[in-house]
Amino acid sequence: MFDVLMYLFETYIHTEAELRVDQDKLEQDLTNAGFDREDIYNALLWLEKLADYQEGLAEPMQLASDPLSMRIYTPEECERLDASCRGFLLFLEQIQVLNLETREMVIERVLALDTAEFDLEDLKWVILMVLFNIPGCENAYQQMEELLFEVNEGMLH
């Protein structure tokens, strides 16, 4: 499922291709690209739920907004988000790429992923997808994109 999301993000969203694609055509394109029908369905459902945030149909879990409060992760969250992922989320909050609401959206979307393997690089892409879809997060999206691509470009040299 995560492979389908990555493919969609890179092919349709990140490249600013036509964003209004007929769902049947999209499913056919993904099938032709070699993706499993169940993975396609799950990825599209995942994106629909993400779009609910954009349209105001879903709200992230509301937490205390005291700047001195600390987010305690549940065992399920710790299982999916290892220490490096949790540390990265904290870092993004500290540099104001994420706020309490967007952090919770990211965590919720990570937990909704149907994948056994999940690492820091995957988290970065989920964060990009969430920020891309939330109105008013354009600057945060740009900062996150710079963080993602600067680190990856640095690894190539």
Curated annotation (Swiss-Prot):
Question: Which InterPro entries does the record cross-reference, listed alphabetically?
Answer: Smg
A Pfam family this protein belongs to? Answer: DUF494
Q: Which NCBIfam families does this one have? A: PRK03430.1 (NF002897)
Family to which the UniProt record says this protein belongs? Belongs to the Smg family.
What is the protein's name according to its record?
Protein Smg
Species of origin: Escherichia coli O7:K1 (strain IAI39 / ExPEC)
Q: Which gene encodes it?
A: smg
